[in-house]
Regions:
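Hydrophobic-core positions in well-structured secondary-structure elements of globular domains
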Residues: 1-211
């Protein structure tokens, strides 16, 4: 079972509710002109091409890193994360979150139970020589993220049956207001321990309304 909680060193600013894709009244946190410099220092820019094509890293008190990106066109989390790493290595702009830069991230809260079909009904052999297959594999994921930090709990269960993953001159707007990808990674590790892509904000926030 995976269970983690993390806190940001400083609390991000609660922003006004806004739009996300086709939805309105979405709760946001982030950085605006009123935000303290210490909060800006806990954000690292990985790369920035536009307000809808970028990646950032949020630092925590623990050794967890929250990576958020937009504009990725790859088809799976492995390729998206690889692309983020490559784009970050090539980026020549400022990786510091500057005084005029803005950040807007939606609050996230979901409790998801999904069936992992790719491992079902594939035979494997135990050390006792008996052959089994996974009849049904389920994974439950609880994840929350807000201006203070976040937490994640993930557990899997399965049933068996016997058989016969420098400041820039212009201000930058990091707007997470449409489809985005989020990764959680331990500092110093090559790969993340959690990934999610969010396109329908109504699945992770209550009280949002369709435009």
């Amino acid at each position: 079972m995976l269970k983690k909680e993390f806190e940001f060193p400083k609390v991000f600013t609660k922003l006004e509710n806004g739009d996300f894709g086709k939805y309105k009244n979405v709760k946001y946190f982030g950085i605006d002109s009123s935000t303290d410099e210490a909060v800006r220092n806990q954000v690292e820019v990985l790369y920035y091409n536009s307000s809808s094509d970028f990646a950032i890293k949020l630092k925590t008190k623990q050794n967890d890193e929250v990576i958020i990106s937009r504009g990725n066109t790859e088809n799976n989390f492995g390729d998206i994360f690889k692309s983020i790493t490559q784009n970050s290595d090539k980026y020549k702009g400022s990786k510091r979150f500057n005084e005029n830069d803005k950040l807007k991230i939606p609050n996230i809260k979901f409790n998801l139970k999904e069936e992992i079909t790719e491992v079902e009904n594939k035979p494997f052999t135990f050390s006792n020589g008996k052959e089994y297959c996974i009849e049904k594999a389920l994974q439950t994921i609880q994840f929350e993220l807000d201006e203070k930090g976040g937490k994640i709990k993930s557990e899997a269960g399965m049933s068996l049956k016997a058989t016969a993953i420098m400041p820039t001159e212009k201000p930058r707007d990091f707007l997470v207001d449409d489809t985005f990808t989020i990764f959680l990674k331990e500092e110093g590790r090559d790969l993340p321990y959690f990934a999610a892509q969010i396109s329908d904000i109504s699945q992770v926030q209550e009280d949002v309304k369709e435009n």
